[in-house]
Amino acid sequence: VLNPGSSWIENISSFGQNGTRQILLESSTIPQLGLQKRLSYLLSYPYGCLEQTVSAAFAQLYLDKWVQLNPQQEKQRIKHIQSAIQQINRFQLPSGGFSYWPGNYQFDEWISSYTGQFLIEAKMAGFLVPSMMLKKWEKFQIKLVKGISLNAVWASSEVTQMNQAYRLYTLALSGKPEKGAMNQMRELKSIYSPAANRLAGAYAVTGNKETGNRLLTGKNKKATSIGKTATYGSDIRDRAQMLETYIQLGNPQKSGELAALLSKEFSSGNWHSTHATACVLLALSKYLGEQKAGAPAAFKFQARETKGTWMEVQHTQPIGFTQIQDFVGKQKIRIQNTGKSKLFLQLIQSGKESLGEVKASASGIELSTHFFTAEGLELDPAEIPQGIDFQAEIRVKHTGENPYSYKDLGLTQVFPSGWEIINERMNDFSLNQNNDFDFMDLKDDQTSYFFSLAEGQAKKFTVKLNATFSGKYYFPAATVTDMYHVPIHAQTTGKWISVARAKTN
């Protein structure tokens, strides 16, 4: 924290491989959120399910309202959102709903509502959204809303309540409110808090703020882990969606309290899923975008690149980023607050670790990679003759130390550039119907699997390879993580391998 007229000196050392290093100075007139770290996490997330595609774009939708973006950054923001809208089309089913993975035939209730909310708000923000995509989605939502009957089973189901309330909210947002279903749900004797919140938002959007406020002040049931797991949720996700509702209800006191709470949690550095991260950034964007602008941030800094001179920086939005030139070794950075506002500063360094620095780790799951010849004999990958076909067998196992199933695991193995993957996916029907995974993503040099594991269950995934190019190569670590529960993870070590040149006659 730097008061007006104060200075700050920081000694930093270079980090990461050449060509991967980046140093940013995040300056803010509001308490730090760790915004750059959160955005980088969303934008660099390696998988491409619909939730993660939408989350990366949704978090940027209102970014220009509270973050100082240069022309290039603004161009990138717009391009990313437009690209996401185009990609979403691959996930829409004939029913109008959306699947979690492209090519899947089962719609996901929560993600269908989440995607619809993004498309509606993107359209409101001036982005071109295909009208047919929205019309099909609206019909799908209305059909599901009308298909719910208020029987005893439904009335007590947390997951069904949450999905129904989110559908009602998104339809209201789209200008197609199902008021009869809204009133029926409001009259339930017992309603879970996240569902009551989304229903209150539906009433707020349709102009009935009084009913919305009553829903939030009622004795609602607390959300459980069952509801959170089924809707990719968490406590912070639910608070973020509640902040959206209080903004819509015009309650500045509650909005301010929740915004402060979310900001504090985000600045802690704790891990949050892509969905939770996007929901928080979306809610804070809406809150901060409505606040009156204070005094602009103004400071000057000295670094190695300035060669002893001071570089002046100003931004009128609450948050700004200043790129510091890459360097090798150590350097001293001096910053002086020349403005009238208190400054919250953070230096952010990023870069890929040097080869060989990745260490094995595991929590709740075991991971290993084994190699075999085409005849099934075990093979040492340290040195493989050029030209031979062989296979990698990646094994994962639920250790059983956690008494529940892992539902959203993502496993990735990148292979050395001297090896080539033999792609049999297109001509092997069994691969596309494999019950061991929900989705497989095969690229030139890597393969990713997305699957679930029951308690104590083990699975193995086989990749056929060819030792194509002679030479020495780095074999990166394999990783497996639970995409919505980060303590569940495992990583192997990276190592050097070689492909021995084939002998010529």
Task: Please give the residue ranges for each predicted region.
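Long, domain-scale non-catalytic interaction/scaffolding regions in large secretory-pathway
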Residues: 1-23, 154-505
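Extended, solvent-exposed functional surface patches
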Residues: 1-158, 164-165, 319-369
